[in-house]
């Protein structure tokens, strides 16, 4: 019987398997940031160990970095804990070393799941880990990538391996093509809406089908980024010419003969025709419309042309209770059209949607509409995912498009995705966000998050409420 893409990468990296299925898995790339690494470095130090393979580490500061005040340098980091975590990372990498380190305010600094791929740290066939749940992003390259906890960060540093049990295989196919105005973010939100946030639990998901193949590498990263929101620890897309072209000539990519050898191997990284999947889910791309989450879980999502659901129509008592709780927190009434939901803030950024394609997508909407940010919007911020994305966007004049319309053009970082830095929602504020989680308090205590694509967020900023972006596509 043939093997799935997941099977192939797993088999290449298993060092040993116990009778109960617990395996020792070799790790190729270890991505490190300032929040989940300090305890691991200290644990290594106290145990008198050394990092096993320094050349596997690529590090950056992202979660705590401010997106304003860079002219003040490290003094611009107002929160003392955030400042300590960032400076501690600097000290740890200075002591231990790394294949590459992009410190706060450096040209290539940015969100770890953006700077990894753009620097060639993520390559097809790799096993990639990071102390961050959205490490699944890197699966877009045909890599087995997933988040790990802080104790596991230390374990990988010490041994270059991880204890793991193999997951089951799930295939999600998106047939046909999507309509203009429907993006990778809409595709993955529609998938989560279909299978739920627990649908992928215990699985590694391979995303396939014509609509997935048609996506750029940046779009595929968006899809794999949110595999974790579907319950799967990892998501994958098979390697093709787009994958190989993207990683070519990146700083950490192989060159010369090693490049040729790598490409020959990478071209084998796809599921065999007779591979077995434990579960297969199919969606029709033509049925997917721009998505908006209405509740407090990514699975609470509907097309922008729909209305807030009525809990009284839900027969399952547990689901009914969840809907009622979500509507109370979100301050929404059943039956309210999503198009009629007004927002207070707009956030375009995060490891889901802060790459150059996302910047272009949002700027194109702003330019086409030819309007300024609506008067009811308190803040509309655009936060590029890295210094390189920011630089490229400014070369293309995208920053001027945003600023002319009243958006704030910020420095790179995780920003308002999570309430761990200065960018956050105040209690009761409602946000159109291109991030990946809409849990209670995710963007700030009492804040209300609606997940959308960059195009949808940009349109909401200038209209003041959600609109169907297909009207302007």
UniProtKB/Swiss-Prot annotation:
The keyword Amino-acid biosynthesis applies. This is 3-isopropylmalate dehydratase large subunit. NCBIfam families: leuC (TIGR00170), PRK05478.1 (NF004016), PRK12466.1 (NF009116). Pathway: Amino-acid biosynthesis; L-leucine biosynthesis; L-leucine from 3-methyl-2-oxobutanoate: step 2/4. Keywords: 4Fe-4S, Amino-acid biosynthesis, Branched-chain amino acid biosynthesis, Iron, Iron-sulfur, Leucine biosynthesis, Lyase, Metal-binding. HAMAP family: LeuC_type1. InterPro entries: 3-IsopropMal_deHydase_lsu, Acnase/IPM_dHydase_lsu_aba_1/3, Acoase/IPM_deHydtase_lsu_aba, Aconitase_4Fe-4S_BS, Aconitase_4Fe-4S_dom, IPM_dehydratase_rel_enz, IPMI_cat. GO terms for biological process: L-leucine biosynthetic process. CDD domains: IPMI. It comes from the Bacteria. [4Fe-4S] cluster binds at residues 351, 414, 417. Catalyzes the isomerization between 2-isopropylmalate and 3-isopropylmalate, via the formation of 2-isopropylmaleate. Heterodimer of LeuC and LeuD. GO terms for molecular function: 3-isopropylmalate dehydratase activity; 4 iron, 4 sulfur cluster binding; metal ion binding. Its cofactor is [4Fe-4S] cluster. It is an enzyme of class 4 (lyase). Its EC number is 4.2.1.33. Belongs to the aconitase/IPM isomerase family. LeuC type 1 subfamily. It catalyses: (2R,3S)-3-isopropylmalate = (2S)-2-isopropylmalate. Transmembrane segments: none annotated. Pfam families: Aconitase. The lineage of its organism: Bacteria, Pseudomonadati, Pseudomonadota, Betaproteobacteria, Burkholderiales.
């Amino acid at each position: 019987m043939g093997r799935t893409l997941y099977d192939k990468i797993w088999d290449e990296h298993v060092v040993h398997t116990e009778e109960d299925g617990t395996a020792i898995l070799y790790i190729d790339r270890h991505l490190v940031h300032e929040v989940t690494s300090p305890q691991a470095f200290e644990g290594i130090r106290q145990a008198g160990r050394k990092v096993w393979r320094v050349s596997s580490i690529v590090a950056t500061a992202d979660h705590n970095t401010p997106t304003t005040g860079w002219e003040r340098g490290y003094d611009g980091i107002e929160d003392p804990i955030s400042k300590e975590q960032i400076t501690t990372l600097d000290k740890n990498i200075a002591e231990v070393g790394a294949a590459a380190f992009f410190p706060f305010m450096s040209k290539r600094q940015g969100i770890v799941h953006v700077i990894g791929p753009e620097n060639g740290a993520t390559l097809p066939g790799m096993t990639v880990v990071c102390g961050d749940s959205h490490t699944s992003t890197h699966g877009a390259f045909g890599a087995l990538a997933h988040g790990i906890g802080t104790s596991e960060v230390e374990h990988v540093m010490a041994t270059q391996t991880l204890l793991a049990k193999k997951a089951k295989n799930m295939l999600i196919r998106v047939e046909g093509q999507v309509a203009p105005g429907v993006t990778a973010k809409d595709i993955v939100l529609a998938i989560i809406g279909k299978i739920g946030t627990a649908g992928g639990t215990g699985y590694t998901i391979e995303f396939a089908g014509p609509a997935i193949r048609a996506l750029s590498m940046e779009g595929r990263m968006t899809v794999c980024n949110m595999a974790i929101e579907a319950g799967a620890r990892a998501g994958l897309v098979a390697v093709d010419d787009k994958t190989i072209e993207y990683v070519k000539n990146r700083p950490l990519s192989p060159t010369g003969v090693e490049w040729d050898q790598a490409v020959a191997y990478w071209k084998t990284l796809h599921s065999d025709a007779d591979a077995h999947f434990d579960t297969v889910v199919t969606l029709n791309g033509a049925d997917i419309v721009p998505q908006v989450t209405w509740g407090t879980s990514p699975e609470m999502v509907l097309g922008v042309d729909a209305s807030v659901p009525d809990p009284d129509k839900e027969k399952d008592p547990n689901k009914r209770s969840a809907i009622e709780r979500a509507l109370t927190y979100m301050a929404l009434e059943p039956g309210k059209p999503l198009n009629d939901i007004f927002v207070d803030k707009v956030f375009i950024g995060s490891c889901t949607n802060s790459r150059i394609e996302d910047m272009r997508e949002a700027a194109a909407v702003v330019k086409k509409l030819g309007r300024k940010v609506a008067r009811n919007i308190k803040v509309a911020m655009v936060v590029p995912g890295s210094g390189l994305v920011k630089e490229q966007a400014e070369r293309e004049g995208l920053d001027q498009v945003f600023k002319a319309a009243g958006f704030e053009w910020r420095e790179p970082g995780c920003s308002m995705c999570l309430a761990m830095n200065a960018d956050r929602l105040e209690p009761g504020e409602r946000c159109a966000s291109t991030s990946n989680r809409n849990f209670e308090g995710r963007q700030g205590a009492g804040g209300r998050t609606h997940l959308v694509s960059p195009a949808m967020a940009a349109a909401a900023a200038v209209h003041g409420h959600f609109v169907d972006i297909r009207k302007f596509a």
